Regions:
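N-terminal lobe/hinge region of extracytoplasmic solute-binding protein
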Residues: 30-80, 109, 167
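Ligand-site clamp/hinge motif
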Residues: 190-233
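Long beta-strand-rich cores associated with HINT superfamily self-processing modules
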Residues: 461-485
């Protein structure tokens, strides 16, 4: 009798497969932080956008050469400060409604009403709907800047349903968000680029980098974002795992609150800059896999200038510090991240050598973002992705007076020359002249040190060797629509 039931069970399983009910293909991805919301317009942190990138699409994306090309756009033309664009026809939202010009207009206007993304659509003066599939955007600035801005993952085109729930056109649709620690997406069979080969994506929050590696090794997950440089070595001896590492658009930096004494003193910030041993940070924390930074923006970003940074010079730093007779104490804020804590420890030791006592304060990410936006800090260690591949998105949010606080300028820096150069660069039609303005900005920042760039981030992705079709994105929002497992 037992043999009969065993044979019957196997028969039922085979019958399910034959009838088109195979086991679902699931891929699990480990993130360092929880996604904050499925709304890409309101939260631009890398974990949120890593997830929402799979749910929504952009009008434009960047190719491997940092050139803008259409995603939802079939073709476009530029005349002076005006862009005319034709939408691809037949693209469906996940509720079955077709993409049209009115929805695109509403989505961009929504971006304009939200402070954190407003900076990206500021160049838009007016949006005109010509017909169901054609739009005209009139800009107040250089059109090229807007095109690059529209590639940012927070510029995804969204549609609100009758319950105000956001819907996208992406390869996967939201099944479960919960607290953000476990997010489940299911494939969109009507995806305009073709139905994904994976049925379910699960994004799991695994805060510690070594634990992400262990989860990958035990096949609890199949893809791990942001593998630590120390764990990279382990991949060399693995027959099942491989590491993908490329220069990202990200820069780790020290941001100094220029409104708080004594750090409002330019000379003190200069001493701090000379005292930080960036080479040691790269060697000890990143095992020389990253690159010492001389700018907020990375070398693969338009507008980058290879200006020599202030080299580590302890004697110069000590010489400047002779002017300060009273002890100096500062708090250095970081969010929960192993490499940020290690970086803070090295900076703490560096500054102790010149008489500055640094106390490290570790905060949960949401508290860190909220309190630093309010200017409660002395200094912080941050990471910024110039995700558009254009210097405007590196410099304008981090340095312009209009961007103070939550938009990005957490150093509360206000330099009229820098403000003017940024405004002029947005209006300048010639790329070479724009580059000259960004070069001058970089020189001013290296002189005044409101932000001290430390290293350019190399992004390490650990994947199971059975994963095929993974597409690396230098902004950290990797594309999973074509993966197979």
């Amino acid at each position: 009798m037992k043999s009969f039931f065993k044979i019957f069970t196997i028969f039922i399983l085979l019958l399910n497969i034959a009838l088109g009910n195979p086991e679902k293909k699931i891929v699990k991805i480990g993130l360092g932080y929880s996604g904050r919301s499925y709304d890409p317009h309101k939260h631009t942190d890398s974990s949120t956008l890593a997830i929402t990138k799979q749910i929504y699409n952009n009008l434009f994306i960047l190719d491997n050469e940092n050139e803008v090309k259409g995603e939802l756009i079939e073709n476009y033309s530029i005349k002076n400060n005006t862009i005319e664009m034709d939408l691809k026809k037949g693209i469906l939202f996940q509720d079955g409604e077709e993409l049209n010009s009115e929805i695109v207009k509403k989505s961009l206007e929504r971006n304009k009403s939200i402070p954190v993304t407003k900076v990206l659509v500021d160049p838009i003066e007016k949006i005109e709907v010509i017909d169901k599939y054609k739009l005209r955007i009139i800009c107040t600035t250089n059109v090229d800047i807007l095109l690059h801005n529209l590639t940012h993952s927070s510029m995804a085109i969204v549609k609100e349903d009758k319950n105000k729930k956001l819907i996208g056109t992406g390869a996967f649709k939201l099944l479960e968000w919960g607290t953000g620690e476990k997010v489940i997406l299911e494939k969109n069979d009507n995806y305009f680029k073709g139905s994904p080969k994976i049925d379910i994506l699960e994004f799991l929050t695994i805060p510690e980098a070594p634990n992400r590696y262990i989860a990958l090794e035990t096949n609890e997950i199949q893809i791990a974002y942001d593998i630590s440089s120390i764990d990279v070595k382990a991949f060399k001896n693995s027959k099942d795992l491989e590491i993908l590492n490329k220069l990202s658009y990200g820069t780790d930096f020290l941001s100094i609150n220029t409104e708080k004494a004594p750090l409002n003193d330019k000379r003190l910030r200069e001493a701090i800059s000379y005292a930080i041993d960036k080479d040691s940070i790269n060697e000890v924390i990143f095992e020389n896999t990253s690159k010492v930074a001389n700018s907020i923006i990375t070398p693969n970003t338009f507008g980058y200038s290879n200006k020599e940074e202030k080299k580590y010079n302890l004697e110069k730093a000590k010489q400047i510090m002779k002017d300060y007779k009273t002890p100096i104490e500062i708090e250095l804020w970081i969010y929960e991240d192993t490499s940020k804590y290690q970086m803070a420890q090295i900076i703490q030791a560096n500054l102790k050598e010149i008489g500055i006592d640094v106390k490290i304060q570790t905060l949960e990410l949401s508290s860190f973002l909220q309190l630093t936006a309010q200017g409660k800090h002395n200094a912080l260690i941050g990471l910024w992705y110039t995700s558009t591949g254009d210097a405007d998105y590196g410099y304008y949010p981090l340095l312009h007076n209009n961007s103070r606080g939550g938009v990005g300028n957490r150093s509360f820096y206000n330099n009229q020359r820098v403000n003017t150069l940024l405004d002029e660069a947005r209006k300048e039609p010639l790329k070479e002249k724009r580059k000259e303005k960004y070069k001058e900005i970089q020189e001013i920042i290296l002189d005044e040190n409101p932000i001290i760039p430390i290293v350019y981030k190399t992004y390490n992705i650990g994947i199971n060797k059975n994963i095929k079709g993974f597409k690396f994105n230098p902004n950290g929002n990797h594309i999973l629509e074509n993966i197979e497992y």
